[in-house]
Amino acid sequence: MGVDEPHAVGKDRLVDAAYAAANFPLPVVTVDLGTATTFNVVDENRVFRGGVICPGLSTGLRALGDRCAQLPQVHLGSPKSAIGTNTEKCMLSGSVMGTAVLIDGMVQRIEEELGRPATLVVTGGLAKYVTPLCRHPLTYDPELLMKGLALLYQLNASQPQHHSAGGGRHYGRQNQHGHAKQRTSPKKRTRREPE
């Protein structure tokens, strides 16, 4: 991976990226619209390069309602235009259309850094509000994470299992050489009849 701290990358981000890299032309950018909005970049050599993390759509709207005294809580929806004619419409446009513009602009910057066009795949619970407003060509796949988990499960299941030199785990008592003692059934004792 082409990142500074591979262990710190969110597993959901890696799963999204793994599925996209296996099923779409490279380079590929995945965008997951949830509590946070995350961008994940896989280059033409299948190297996970990192990405972008910013506040999610609903997180930003909720923060405006909580932190700004004059602004209400707004329910998510699709804005009809960029220019809002009241406070709620302005907030909706800024959040939903603003996220679409963020995606378009960020993918353009990513493509410039990669030096080539990228495939864009969008997923997440809030993507349905945003994807119709994006101008960059994209694929919307609401099941990207589930498909990624299924893919990784299949890949892991198809790998040969490696066992210890002794052929796996041994249960029961071990002899002085560390090998499991073979269990044998006790010998039947027969009663001798007197002669």
Regions found by a protein language model. Name each.
Residues T30, T37-V42:
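Short beta-strand scaffold segments in enzyme catalytic cores
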Residues T35-T37, K128:
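Gly/Ser/Thr-rich loops at beta-strand to alpha-helix junctions
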